[in-house]
Amino acid sequence: MAPEVMCKQNHGVSVDYYAVGVIAYECMMGRRPYNGKGRREIRDLILARQIKIDYNEIPQGWSTSAVDFINGLIKRKPAQRLGANGPSEIKLHPWFRDFDWDALESYKMDSPFKPPTDDENFDKKNSESEWKDINEESLQHCIELL
């Protein structure tokens, strides 16, 4: 959780960039950026010090631009965080140098992973017509409850 959320300060989309940075850190390093025995201890660690990946601890297969990207996302101060000045900061980062943003935005990019379509473990009774039979009045009532 981003420090500004923990401190109950006003926040914006940069808290999501922080979250992506934490996830990317975990993917790269194979561990959490902050380790504590409980939520309070983890919160105190996040608020006490800035974590970063040192260039001398880059795992094999990862680049320095990936480290720079992750370190930019996990900045404690939102104004210093990568993406604080808009999504173009993310899109223009060197780690995405060869990424085709236009193909992504126009849905022309193939997924790098396609899960099997085997529905053997899927209970079909949960998807069959139960929502098709709902009348307009019931649907409106559901919408009002939301």
Give residue ranges: language-model regions:
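Conserved end of the kinase activation segment
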Residues: 4-14
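Structural helix C-cap motif within protein kinase domains
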Residues: 29-32
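Short proline-rich PxxP-based motifs
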Residues: 48-59
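Conserved C-terminal C-lobe helix
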Residues: 61-73
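A conserved short helix/loop substructure at the end of the activation segment
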Residues: 72-86
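C-terminal regulatory tails of eukaryotic serine/threonine kinases
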Residues: 84-146
